[in-house]
């Protein structure tokens, strides 16, 4: 948000704010350039990813002779190295790089949790604001392009899931009435202890409100229904992922060299973000939303460098019947395209599945 809300435009060189050692490598220049370097080196994610549509980039790679997913990523690496392909962070104010849809969920971003609220009003929404700061970044950035004039109103659509008419809802194009805490089934826990707090629905959601799960499920269903107009068949997408904490990725850069500056070679997953080709089957997006896929059976669950095999638990889940109504005491499966999957169609299905696979609640997994 620092880049897209154009807050970087109102900041100058580091030397304007504090004394800087003469031979320092990092504490110099402009914050926007350091953020661009962090994206180039795989230290942080940034969306949109590229100035070109990643689905179109895959097609370009295939037209250039790339046949396998590995060849597609190799093509992309060469394009990036030759500066024929550009990360969006390098030119955040180009229209191709604007974020267009903002879905606000479980927070009051506008006028509350968004740091630099007035900049969001001006550059995200294009509405009235009370900014008194002047732009200082012109001529101060080397990697990030400074475009004039600064764009106002980047967002085409703002959607808010909310049970309050707070400031985010007031500024949104669409407000989707969400269920209150006591109108949904949920699981609460934290990373500080292993206690699990199940919350049961006291009353159903009132009027037109829905639970978060049902709202996102409706998104998936409508996307599947409309997919035939744009994506009648599965398409391949080029996806970046940052280097991850508590994984071998942490050993990838003993020296933080920047390939974009010519200090080293671009190597996905080592000196730059991971690059992966992912197949998007939008026609089956809803089916996949309500199903717990089979990949976890082979790969297991992982986090913080620890892998937990759950093959036995997955096979046990497949023994449950297909169909029926959601029940906190029984589990279900769904079936589509001739295959059977553990169901996560309802929040009760999802909660039961989590309790079945979590080591905190299933001693066999622990």
Describe these PLM feature segments.
Residues 1-160, 165-366:
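Domain-level signature for respiratory redox metalloenzymes
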């Amino acid at each position: 948000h620092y880049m897209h809300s154009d807050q970087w435009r109102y900041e100058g060189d580091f030397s304007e704010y504090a004394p800087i050692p003469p031979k320092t490598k990092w504490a110099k220049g402009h914050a926007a350039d350091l953020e661009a370097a962090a994206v180039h080196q795989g230290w942080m994610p940034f969306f949109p990813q590229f100035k070109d549509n990643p689905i179109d980039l895959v097609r370009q790679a295939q037209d250039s002779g790339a046949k396998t997913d590995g060849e597609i990523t190799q093509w992309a690496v060469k394009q990036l190295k030759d500066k024929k392909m550009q990360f969006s962070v390098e030119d955040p104010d180009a229209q191709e790089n604007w974020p267009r849809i903002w879905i606000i969920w479980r927070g009051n971003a506008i006028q509350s949790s968004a740091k630099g609220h007035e900049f969001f009003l001006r550059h995200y929404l294009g509405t009235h604001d009370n900014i008194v700061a002047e732009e200082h970044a012109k001529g101060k950035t080397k990697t990030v392009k400074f475009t004039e004039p600064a764009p106002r109103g980047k967002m085409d659509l703002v959607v808010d899931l909310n049970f309050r008419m707070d400031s985010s809802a007031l500024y949104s194009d669409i407000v989707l009435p969400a269920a209150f805490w006591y109108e949904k089934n949920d699981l609460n826990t934290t990373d500080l202890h292993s206690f699990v707090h199940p919350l049961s629905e006291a009353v159903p959601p009132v009027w037109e409100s829905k639970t978060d799960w049902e709202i996102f499920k409706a998104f998936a269903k409508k996307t599947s229904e409309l997919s035939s107009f744009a994506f009648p068949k599965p398409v391949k997408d080029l996806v970046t992922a940052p280097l991850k904490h508590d994984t071998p990725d942490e050993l990838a850069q003993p020296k933080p060299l920047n390939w974009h500056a010519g200090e080293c070679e671009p190597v996905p997953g080592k000196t730059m973000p991971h690059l992966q080709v992912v197949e998007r089957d939008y026609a089956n997006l809803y089916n996949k939303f309500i199903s717990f896929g089979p990949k976890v059976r082979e790969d297991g669950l992982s986090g913080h460098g620890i892998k937990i095999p759950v093959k036995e638990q997955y096979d046990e889940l497949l023994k449950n019947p297909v169909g029926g109504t959601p029940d906190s005491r029984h589990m279900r499966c769904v079936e589509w395209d001739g295959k059977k999957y553990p169901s996560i169609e309802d929040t009760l299905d999802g909660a039961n599945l989590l309790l079945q696979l979590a080591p905190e609640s299933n001693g066999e997994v622990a």
